[in-house]
Amino acid sequence: MKKLRWVLLIVIIAGCLLLWTQMLNVMCDQDVQFFSGICTINKFIPW
């Protein structure tokens, strides 16, 4: 039962990360000033 809980946690975290990167990409495409620094870093990370 504990193993299942860990798997669920990992899946949820992975899903959140995917959503976060998608959101970042959208923000970068719209060239939002606040995200410009994050976008520069984001380009170096191979998502």
UniProtKB/Swiss-Prot annotation:
GO terms for cellular component: plasma membrane. The chain crosses the membrane at residues 6-26. The keyword Glycosyltransferase does not apply. PROSITE patterns: PROKAR_LIPOPROTEIN. Keywords: Cell inner membrane, Cell membrane, Membrane, Transmembrane, Transmembrane helix. Belongs to the MgrB family. PhoP-regulated transcription is redox-sensitive, being activated when the periplasm becomes more reducing. MgrB acts between DsbA/DsbB and PhoP/PhoQ in this pathway. Represses PhoP/PhoQ signaling, possibly by binding to the periplasmic domain of PhoQ, altering its activity and that of downstream effector PhoP. May form homooligomers. Probably interacts with the periplasmic domain of PhoQ. This is PhoP/PhoQ regulator MgrB. It comes from Klebsiella pneumoniae (strain 342). The lineage of its organism: Bacteria, Pseudomonadati, Pseudomonadota, Gammaproteobacteria, Enterobacterales.
